[in-house]
Amino acid sequence: MKELKGSKTEANLMAAFAGESQARNKYTYFASKARKEGFVQIADIFEETANNEKEHAKIWFKLLHNGIGSTEDNLLAAAEGENYEWTDMYKQFAEEAHEEGFENIAKLFEGVAKIEKEHEERYRALLENVKTGAVFERKSETVWQCANCGHIYVGTTA
């Protein structure tokens, strides 16, 4: 197979992924608004379409990334993405908003950057738990609840 990297097709896949991802979010917001306004059937159709768009985006994502990685790989990728967002992207966006006099937007960018930093820390902690085998283990007694049946267990391991 030809090399995808640097090709127009790669750029098109990235645009398709971005477009489908944005459409999914937009339709989810539209569904929420329709539901609040009492248009349940319309909300359901927006949600159904949002789920379709999610699946379309997944096709393009898998082609761009040769599938979906392991949980360990995905946690690292997520942490790195969050790091970029809070250290570079939102920092630059906030500076530019300040320069242009959009103080309220600059503050929002700065606030979201702080949240992205927390996201990075959370992903890195989860990654460490996976690497050390501590996902289902705690140092002190913890309440564990089965996500399937709801059974409650108290102990240091799930």
Predicted regions and their residues:
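Non-heme di-metal
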Residues: 1-158
